[in-house]
Each structure stands twice: as C-alpha cells, then as structure tokens.
Amino acid sequence: MSSLTDKTRNGALKRNLLRQMLKASVFKFGEFQLKSGQISPIYIDLRECFGHPGLLMLISEAISKQVEISEVQYAGVLGIPYAALPYASVAAGNYLKKPLLIVRKEAKSYGTKKLIEGLYQPNDRLILIEDVVTTGGSILDVVKVLHTENLVASDVFCILDREQGGRQKLQDAGVTLHSLLDMQTVLTFLYSTGAIGDEQWHGIVQALNLPYTSPTKLEINSELENLSSLPYVENVRTPLAERESLTESALIKKILGIMRRKKSNLCLAVDYTTVEQCLQMIELAGPFVLAIKLHADAITDFNEEFTRKLTTMANDMDFIIFEDRKFGDTGNTNLLQLTGAQKIANWADVVTVHAVQGSDSIAGVFRKLAKDPTYRLSGVLLIAQLSTKGSLTALEGYTETAVKIANENRDVISGFITQTRVSACSDLLNWTPGVNLDAKSDSAGQQWRGVDEAIEVQQNDIIIVGRGVTSSSEPVQQLKRYRQIAWDALTRSDDSI
C-alpha cells in the first residue's frame, strides 16, 4: 500500500493507473456474480480498459516494470486467455521486447492444429500475464498445458490480486504470483478519494471475507502525476566515497574528489556575453562551486587570453570547466568543432553531447580526445532530459536510448544532463538544470523546481543554477545558500561524509 504515497516513478505510475481506472468506470458497484460463483458488491472490470488506449498502455507499462523489478529470467511472455491478451501483447512487444505466446482453449481442427501459438523451444521458461487472480484456477490450467510441451512457467504477473486464496493455491503448485495491485490498495484508494464511504468499504470487506478491520484514509491528489519528473531507477544512491573508489573514470574521480573537498555539488551557469562579465562572476563563484558552466559561442569577445585565465582560475580554485556546447553532429564535424576556432578541447574539462547522433559518433571522437593528454577535455555529459516545456527528449525511448549509450561507454561518458536520475550505474553522475529557489518559470519556456525536489526526490547529484545567482544583487550570499542546501540534500543519508 506504500505505492499510494511513495515518491517513486513506480508509485506514481500505480497511482495514475488507479486514477484512470476510476475515470474509465473500471470499478463497478452493485451485486455481481464472480466466476467462482461468489456474490460480490464490487466488480473490477478490466475489460473497460480496452476502450482507453492510454490506460491500456499504462497498465502494460506497469506490468512490465514489475517484471523488470522481479529480475526473473524468461524467454517469452504468455497471456492467460483471453482478457489478459491485450496487456501481454503490449508488454511483450512494446516494453519487454520478448516473443508473445498464446494458449488456445482448444486446438483448431485445421491448419497447424497447435494448442500453443508463438516462437518457443522445449524447456523455455515463460512468464505469464493475467488480469485478475481470484482462485488461480485458470493459471494452473495453462501451466498444465505448457508442461505437455516441456515449457516451464513458475511466475505469473497480474494486474489485480483479489486476495481470495489464489496466491496460496498458486504457491502450493510452485507458481509465484507478482501482483500490481491488491484489494487493500484498491479499497484504500477508493476510500481515500471518496469513491466509496464507510458503509460500502465494510460491505465489500465482509462480502469478500477480506482480512481488514477498518478503512485507511490517505492524502492522495486526484491529478495525474508527471512520470518523467520521477527517477527511472529506485535503488539507493551509493555513498560518494564508495562511488569515487569504484569508478574507473579519471574525470568522475576528479569531480567526486572536488565535491568532497569543497562540500559542494553546485554548478554555476555563467551565461554572460562578455569576457569581463564572465571573469568577474567566476572570481566570486570559484570558492563555492564544483563547476562553472559556459556557453562559449555566446561570448562576443571570446579569445584565448580568456581561456588562459579561466583554466588558471579553475586550477587555483579547484573547479571543473563545463562547456555546454551540446554537440550533435557527425563524428568528423564534432572533431572540427572541438579543435576549431574556440579550441574547446584545450580548455574544457567536460562538454555536453546530444544522444541523437548515436553511439559511434559520440564514443569514437570524444574517447580519442579524452585519452590524449595534450587536451584538457576528459569526458562528456549526455543529454537525457531537458528542463524546457515540450522538449522532444520526452518522446518515448529517447531517454532510455541515451542511458544505453552511456552505460556502454562509461570510460568517456561521465553522466547526464537530466531532470531525474536515469541510470542505475553509480559511476554516472546526474547533473540537473532547472533549479531555482525563488521562481517557477520564465516567459521563454524554462521551468524551475526547488533543490530538495531535484536532489532528494529526483535523485540527481549536481544542481546547475544560473539566474538564481547571476541575477541576484547579492550573488555570493546566493552561492552560499544554494551550495549549503544542495549539499545537505545530497549528504543527508550519506554516512561516508
């Protein structure tokens, strides 16, 4: 039931699922006879979801997430006929990327006359997907059919466990039930949102012989939650000292070392257009920040003397130089831009790169420069998410692909520009823009949130702050303020600090 209140992507997904199910009239109240013959005052009609494509996709995503969390090894996905087939089809094809199998209730009298349809080999292990589990009888019938073809099925994933003996019956037969929802969660949600009252709650519990004595009311917002604003992974963040000892990246070791020495996970975005403005702000910020972020192509009088002073200041004040160039071209063009007029590779420690160009264009060129001691450049940050409203990084699959590219090239990719933690790899750092303690948005589509949300809820490591400091009449005070709040948020549960 913690999923009704926890601040995780998986929890938000379940809450959104229940909200949409309620809106789609999935929960029906009256007098209904179940397949088992039992009379129930509530009927949960998951077939209603078929008429709502968004809800069908959401359920399939949620089931797929349950499969991933379970870490069960399997070769294919089988939907229990027939109500679970749409969910199994979407989950297998769109999320799990595994073959779909179907068991017929009876073999055809023509054609191949097969009872089991799909791609499989003898002794393959399958996972089963069901919509509602009451007694578990339908699942065990399918398991018996699979055994006749030497197929193994010991795990079933369902949308709803009605908590009426099915789990135990399946367990006795060697089948583990993984449920997305159970009746306690459903009833708590319905009660908390006012869909049912005390009398209905007690009537349902009594009729279905559920082991609850009194309803629980939780504070549950009725609005849908933005799933992309929550971490993609839910494992506990590794302590900084351990991350520093585990990583093989020289840049990440350097960054984590600076963070621990200066007690700072603050990156300042110095978005000025003249060298003088930049140097003045960097002089003030240097003692308090982990990194200084620049847009070199926005500086109208950019010159080599500026980069000489910049690197000297970085060495003296112990900070990283971060050029936010957002490279996104072919490998050869990237190389020309890195070593061309502004000689970015000579003075920047790290640069940003779009994932759109693909792994080959990123890894080859940037690895070559990062391994060459004649250049200062030693790593890249891959753009996984942006903080602007309507960003195309929110398109399905973009962030996941960026994470895959980074995971496979951790010697040169040191982390992400992101809104939330997107990778389970502890040696990839999550840098997040869009942080402001005093404003929520501007007129150009920029959206901001607070430090605690960015660090503790969304599990980012480093905050990137710009106008919250640079537009202030007291920038040093703001630097101290952001540094302290961000560091406290990052290290609150870190025993290594």
Swiss-Prot record:
One biological process term in Gene Ontology: UMP biosynthetic process
Compartments, record wording: Cytoplasm
Pathway participation: Pyrimidine metabolism; UMP biosynthesis via de novo pathway; UMP from orotate: step 1/2; Pyrimidine metabolism; UMP biosynthesis via de novo pathway; UMP from orotate: step 2/2
Start and end residues of each stretch annotated as OPRTase: 8-226
Tissues where the protein occurs: Expressed in intestine and in neurons near the nerve ring and rectum.
GO CC annotations, alphabetized: cytoplasm
Region: OMPdecase, residue numbers: 233-496
Family stated for the protein in its record: In the N-terminal section; belongs to the purine/pyrimidine phosphoribosyltransferase family.
Protein name (Swiss-Prot/TrEMBL): Uridine 5'-monophosphate synthase
